[in-house]
Amino acid sequence: MNREHKIRGYRNMLGLTQEKLGEELGISKQSYYNKETGKTQFSDKEKLKIKNLLIPLFPEITIEDIFF
């Protein structure tokens, strides 16, 4: 599975739209879209926030699992 599909899959598991996850990260829907599709990179802070949102579903998940 490519990176884009992995990140979208995790977002869907959280039940969040691109707009809502963007809000969680403090960025616009367009900025989030650009990051999810690989046009721009997630910052380390954003990666950590996404990981922390996923911890309740996947207690052992790592940033590497999500983004690489």
Which residues does each PLM region occupy?
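A short, Lys/Arg-rich alpha-helix, primarily the initiator
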Residues: 1-13, 61
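Residues within the helices of the helix-turn-helix
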Residues: 8, 19, 64
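The alpha-helix within a helix-turn-helix
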Residues: 11, 22, 51
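Short alpha-helical DNA-recognition segment
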Residues: 15-34
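Short, solvent-exposed alpha-helical "recognition" segments
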Residues: 39-44
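DNA major-groove recognition helix of helix-turn-helix/homeodomain DNA-binding modules
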Residues: 45-61
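Short amphipathic recognition helices of helix-turn-helix/homeodomain-type DNA-binding modules
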Residues: 62-68
